[in-house]
Amino acid sequence: MNREQSGKTLVLIPARMASTRLPGKPLADICGLPMIVQVARRAAEAEVGRIVVAVDHPDVFAAVTGAGFEAIMTRVDHQSGSDRIHEALLKADPHGEAEIVINVQGDLPTIEPGPIRAALKPLENPATDIATLTVAITDEHEKTNPNVVKVVGSPLSDSRFRALYFTRATAPYGEGPLYHHIGLYAYRRKALETFVSLKPSTLEKRESLEQLRALEAGMRIDVEVVDSVPLGVDTPADLDKARRILSARV
């Protein structure tokens, strides 16, 4: 990515304190730093653009800014991460200079720079509204696990699909690989603005998958295939695993 492209890309990291399974998750210590700071560091390593953390608590704001990163206070009552990043976008970039917004989840402290950069590749096609990531499933249990969201798509190349559907079911039927969706998104700014203006859709509510709102509205989502699923920290066991992974990198 050249400097001009980097200047037009904004990385937004939503951080929410009220996690049900791991309260205070953004401030959980991982190798001497709050988890949200570790995520911001991983995003900085990708070198794709300006980084802003969208927070909903003054303690998280203090942790992020104290580590030298930019933070924006957002409302506590957002129903989704996309609503939070949209509020942060309007506050962080009121003049509309950023053309692309990457949403890196705030619970991915071990993510490598590669997948963050890969999320931008599908947006090289001007017809693509939103880009996201996927990994080929190799674990048989994942194929039937409703917590593993599958991408059903039409191949554009060996490493890219046009998404036709996202589901918790085992799909598509028949022989062939299945793909595990990774919830990291790159939006064109206009696409994000359109998305948050839409009401939750029928299939979105049925599957509890927000991205279906975009597909039902006729928006195009392209999916880049990457090598591995980044660890999402949702439980104390995940937190311990993240600590082991980052300790090994030092």
Swiss-Prot record:
Which EC number applies? 2.7.7.38
Q: Which UniProt keywords apply?
A: Cytoplasm, Lipopolysaccharide biosynthesis, Nucleotidyltransferase, Transferase
Q: Which top-rank group of organisms is this from?
A: Bacteria
Asked if the Swiss-Prot or TrEMBL record annotates the protein with the keyword Endoplasmic reticulum, the reply is: no
Q: Which GO terms describe its biological process?
A: CMP-keto-3-deoxy-D-manno-octulosonic acid biosynthetic process; lipopolysaccharide biosynthetic process
Pfam families reported in the protein's UniProt record: CTP_transf_3
GO CC terms on record? cytosol
The biological pathway it contributes to is: Nucleotide-sugar biosynthesis; CMP-3-deoxy-D-manno-octulosonate biosynthesis; CMP-3-deoxy-D-manno-octulosonate from 3-deoxy-D-manno-octulosonate and CTP: step 1/1; Bacterial outer membrane biogenesis; lipopolysaccharide biosynthesis
* CDD domains registered for this protein in UniProt: CMP-KDO-Synthetase
Which EC class does it fall in? transferase
Q: Where in the cell is it found?
A: Cytoplasm
Q: What's the main place this protein lives?
A: cytoplasm
Do the record's keywords include Cytoplasm?
yes
| One GO MF term | 3-deoxy-manno-octulosonate cytidylyltransferase activity
Catalytic activities:
3-deoxy-alpha-D-manno-oct-2-ulosonate + CTP = CMP-3-deoxy-beta-D-manno-octulosonate + diphosphate
Stored InterPro entries: Cytidylyl_trans, KdsB, Nucleotide-diphossugar_trans
HAMAP family, from UniProt?
A: KdsB (MF_00057)
In the record, the note on similarity to other proteins reads: Belongs to the KdsB family.
| Protein's job | Activates KDO (a required 8-carbon sugar) for incorporation into bacterial lipopolysaccharide in Gram-negative bacteria.
Name of the featured protein:
3-deoxy-manno-octulosonate cytidylyltransferase
